[in-house]
Amino acid sequence: MAAKNFLLTGRPGIGKTTCVVKTAELLVSRGVKVGGMVTHEVREGGSRVGFKVRDLLTGREGFLAKVGAGAGPRVGKYVVHVEELEAVGVGAILRAVSEAQVVVIDEIGPMELYSPSFLPAVLKALDSDKPVLATIHERESSSGRLRGILERGDVKLYTVTLQNRDLLPPQLAREIASLVAR
């Protein structure tokens, strides 16, 4: 089975999200409609205080996690905002499956997996006829929880490194654009 789902893994800070964003920009510049969710850091005074998730089709944002007290699951010093993740992130994935040509999911990680509707949305995207470009947290890519995703015949896994992170976006954009053009 040919790959139509492209997953990027690698150590934290190596450039997985940057690869996905650059690939999405290249696809958009070719006239491809890209949807889904991307995650970015929120910084205050030079310190990371949280993460926001953004819907690529609508531009809507919500907090994925913030430093501090509060109700909700914790990952390290962060409190995961499951409701905002579901409203913005899960909504973005499902919207992209129905409205876009390519689905972006950044990232499949420990924070996102606290949402009971996140993994089903990811699986719906992977099972769709749309190409998926996703990042997967390094620890999750080596754990049993997501082994079923990684062992799919339609998944191609890339490990992002300092050596390949600038080469991957044009390569991925070409591969994905060729799938959309069929």
From Swiss-Prot:
GO MF annotations in UniProt: ATP binding; ATP hydrolysis activity
Residue runs in coiled coils: none
Pfam families tied to this protein: NTPase_1
Binding of ATP, residues: 10-17, 102-109
Main EC class the enzyme belongs to: hydrolase
Record carries keyword ATP-binding: yes
EC number: 3.6.1.15
Top-rank lineage group of the source organism: Archaea
UniProt keywords, alphabetically: ATP-binding, Hydrolase, Nucleotide-binding
InterPro entries in alphabetical order: AAA+_ATPase, Nuc-triphosphatase_THEP1, P-loop_NTPase
Catalytic activity field: a ribonucleoside 5'-triphosphate + H2O = a ribonucleoside 5'-diphosphate + phosphate + H(+)
Tagged with keyword Hydrolase: yes
Family membership: Belongs to the THEP1 NTPase family.
HAMAP family registered for this protein in UniProt: NTPase_1
Functional note: Has nucleotide phosphatase activity towards ATP, GTP, CTP, TTP and UTP. May hydrolyze nucleoside diphosphates with lower efficiency.
Protein name from the UniProt record: Nucleoside-triphosphatase THEP1
Organism: Thermofilum pendens (strain DSM 2475 / Hrk 5)
